[in-house]
Regions:
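Positively charged, phosphate-engaging catalytic surfaces used for nucleic-acid and nucleotide handling
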Residues: 1-178
Length: 178
């Protein structure tokens, strides 16, 4: 069994597409909808682009990335990552794996905007990176507020993977759960 897992991992290192295919299988096995899976894979790509931008500026994974991520979350959702996880009833689970489609889209907008602003402004100090993270989050916050105003529905949802978010449902069905 261990040898098989090691072989699969080595094969995935040689051909990263195998890892992506495995992620698709895993999400499907967990009951996620195709639409949600596509959104989640795109969110992984956008997050990687953002962290690559941070690395390009010499920022460190860990505390600096977590601080900037918290600023992004706090700005667009009015909650830090920890508060957001508590709101959704999560302990160690991945927050993004427990976001609704709308939450994922807004988080992607916040992270994409942060990366774009960083590329444009070329921040030099950590304080400047914090300001950029806030500016990126603000773009998604404005979109969230406008959507909530026009629909009369909250975008931020306590739904998570255990409570049925995106599990074999259409976007319309997901809307009725919120």
């Amino acid at each position: 069994w261990m040898a098989q897992v090691a072989t699969e991992r080595l094969n995935q290192m040689q051909d990263p597409e195998l890892s992506i295919n495995q992620a698709l299988v895993d999400y499907k096995r967990l009951g996620y909808s195709d639409n949600w899976i596509n959104q989640r894979l795109k969110s992984i790509e956008i997050r990687k682009d953002l962290t690559d931008e941070w690395k390009r500026h010499g920022l460190q994974e860990g505390v600096q990335f977590a601080t900037l991520t918290d600023i992004i979350y706090q700005t667009w959702s009015d909650m830090t990552a920890k508060e957001y996880k508590q709101f959704k009833g999560l302990k160690k689970e991945n927050l993004r794996d427990n976001m609704t489609n709308k939450e994922l889209v807004l988080n992607m907008l916040a992270e994409l905007s942060t990366k774009e602003i960083s590329e444009s402004k070329n921040p030099e100090t950590f304080r400047e990176h914090m300001d950029v993270a806030e500016a990126g989050g603000e773009i998604a916050r404005n979109a969230r507020m406008e959507l909530e105003a026009k629909t009369g529905k909250a975008v931020i949802s306590p739904l998570n993977a255990k409570t049925g978010i995106a599990l074999n449902s259409s976007p319309e069905e997901e809307d009725t759960k919120e």
